[in-house]
Amino acid sequence: MLISARRLRRCQFLQLLASCFVLSLMALLVQEDNSLISHVKSYSYRYLINSYDFVNVSLSIPRDRLDGAASYRYLLNNRHICLNEDVLLLLFVKTAPENRRRRDAIRNTWGNEDFIRSQYDANIKVVFALGAEGDPVKSREIQQDLVNENKRFKDLIQQDFSDTFHNLTLKLLLQFGWVNSFCPSAKFIMSADDDIFVHTPNLVSYLKSLPIETQDFWIGRVHRGSPPIRRKTSKYYVPYEMYPWSSYPDYTAGAAYVVSRDVAAKVYEASQTLNTSLYIDDVFMGICANKMGLVPQYHVFFSGEGKSPYHPCIYNKMMTSHGHLDDLDYLWRQAIDPNVKSISSGFWGNLYCRFVNIMLLCRISYVDTYPCSAAWS
């Protein structure tokens, strides 16, 4: 009887433990904003159905009702930037009016057009896309500073919508609308945040290696089957009323991506018939692209939200790295150092960098920079 009682208590304990586990799991599953459930739903839709025609139809509106970028006035415009020039890459940097230091850092490093032209024989144009200061107390002074800045550098493109997170889609329309109107001959167009490091020499070399008439080209950090975030405290919260479906079409992270000029034209065309109230610009871009039958291509050296490891073996292949504010000058000097190429050259150099990249990128604790597969590329 003693043994039976012990066994009984043990069984009761295990049952209690199992019940607690099941109840805890149920409590998680019934939460509306549960991330696991959202991802299961979105991936199920992405891989079982994978059709977003109804999204395109639902978000389409007549042209006469579109509140697009065409209704916003240019406060600053440099329409002659591309005039009579053969431009390999037109690079838009999404910036805020008050971020002068970031713009200057970019001009002095990876956005230095003269350096790229002289050292890499490529004509790139770097322009800064922004809206207007929303604070009426600061707006006059900041706008005058922008006017003075533009007189000196002639690289600001500004419209009179309020420069806020919820107007990022308007900034996207500003970029593709400006390309369509003032620089349609640029072979490639890039959009990047102002806290991004772009390894322009690597990017230019890559773009120059592509066929002359490359079409349907769209590369970056691809998000596939991503669900809308329903958590109201999130910066990226999207209510059901705005987007009721369980999955977004495939899109590239808005931090940095590159498209060919035909893709820019197609996205702009699609944007003219879609509701622009969805304020997450990279998702809106994905919807526009999906409507035109465009598919993004994953490039392993376009970073996610994380910052690239500092190492010459990484610099040799990196395209972008996210989250750089005070270290652009240091990273730029390191990245273009002639010794970087020599470190990875030859059999032993390649083997050494392969080992280093595996150690840096193939971690159990994943950091959102480059995937482990980048170590083998």
Swiss-Prot record:
Keyword Glycosyltransferase: yes
GO BP: protein O-linked glycosylation
Disulfide partners: none
Pathway: Protein modification; protein glycosylation
Enzyme Commission identifier(s): 2.4.1.206
InterPro entries from the UniProt entry: Glyco_trans_31 (IPR002659)
Annotated transmembrane regions: 13-30
Topological domain spans for side Lumenal: 31-377
UniProt membrane topology term: Single-pass type II membrane protein
GO MF entries: glycosyltransferase activity; lactosylceramide 1,3-N-acetyl-beta-D-glucosaminyltransferase activity
Annotated Gene3D superfamilies: 3.90.550.50
Domain of life according to the entry: Eukaryota
Cytoplasmic side: 1-12
Predominant subcellular localization, coarse grouping: Golgi
Subcellular location: Golgi apparatus membrane
Protein name according to UniProt: Lactosylceramide 1,3-N-acetyl-beta-D-glucosaminyltransferase A
Source organism (scientific name): Xenopus laevis
